[in-house]
Amino acid sequence: MIVRSFKEFEGTDRHVKSASGTWESTRIVLAKEKVGFSVHETILYAGTETSMWYANHIEAVVCTKGDAELTDRETGKTYHITPGTMYLLDGHERHTLKVKEDFHCICVFNPPVTGREDHDENGVYPLLTEEV
């Protein structure tokens, strides 16, 4: 059993800030825990727009605080995301989050991330593996 406090992650490599400056993420459960998924608490900043495409991962997201507009770039459909709303990127959809109010969310990834990932020029997380 693993029990952790978010305070344990402050100032560690599990607290990641994006190169784009649009988000920060606390990586709570990672590939090295060997449970088949990873869990993150992520904050996307108000007034930012982040384009993403998880070509190598499935992601489930639950909004816990804030306000954002999610656009599926493949269909053009837009969704209003507020606390209590979830979305699942089960088809590797290219999507954009336009953040109106700091957007706090819990994200689950499969396959799990290692914690070192950041979006590349296409919005993709590379498929990294944990060395044994």
UniProtKB/Swiss-Prot annotation:
Entry-linked InterPro entries: Ectoine_synth (IPR010462), RmlC-like_jellyroll (IPR014710), RmlC_Cupin_sf (IPR011051)
A GO term, aspect molecular function: ectoine synthase activity
Pathway membership, UniProt: Amine and polyamine biosynthesis; ectoine biosynthesis; L-ectoine from L-aspartate 4-semialdehyde: step 3/3
Transmembrane segments: none
The protein's name in its UniProt record: L-ectoine synthase
Reactions it catalyzes: (2S)-4-acetamido-2-aminobutanoate = L-ectoine + H2O
Record EC number: 4.2.1.108
